[in-house]
């Protein structure tokens, strides 16, 4: 389940944050955002976000952990690579994560994926930012 929480006292940036909750192992609790990215022009994506976790455990399989995943696609919309930040597990307070993700030369589009991704517990995200660096 996805919730938008409005709480300026606990949101690390602004007044709202997104929260995912799931009690059913293996359930795909997530949000996606697609965007154009040309690997001939952009070599690196800078990603930053705030994340908080409560009682996070893997899902039906040990690779079902919450993480932030960017999947890159070529001009035929075939997946060519994944870049990941995480996984996240257990309990932890708000913290900022930053990463530099390599953009494949063949990339023309990408999808950013966040959520529990099959895991159980609760994970929250705030102030997700992406910016590109020229090749």
Per-range role (PLM):
Residues 1-135:
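Extracellular and organelle-lumenal recognition/adhesion modules and their flexible linkers in secreted
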């Amino acid at each position: 389940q996805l919730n938008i929480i409005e709480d300026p006292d606990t949101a690390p940036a602004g007044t709202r944050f997104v929260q995912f909750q799931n009690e059913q192992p293996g359930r795909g609790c997530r949000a996606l955002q697609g965007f154009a990215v040309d690997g001939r022009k952009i070599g690196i994506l800078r990603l930053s976000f705030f994340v908080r976790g409560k009682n996070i455990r893997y899902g039906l399989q040990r690779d079902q952990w919450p993480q932030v995943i960017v999947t890159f696609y070529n001009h035929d919309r075939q997946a060519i690579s994944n870049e990941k930040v995480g996984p996240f597990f257990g309990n932890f307070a708000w913290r900022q994560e930053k990463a530099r993700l390599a953009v494949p030369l063949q990339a023309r589009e990408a999808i950013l994926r966040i959520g529990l991704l099959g895991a159980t517990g609760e994970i929250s995200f705030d102030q997700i930012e992406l910016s590109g660096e020229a090749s």
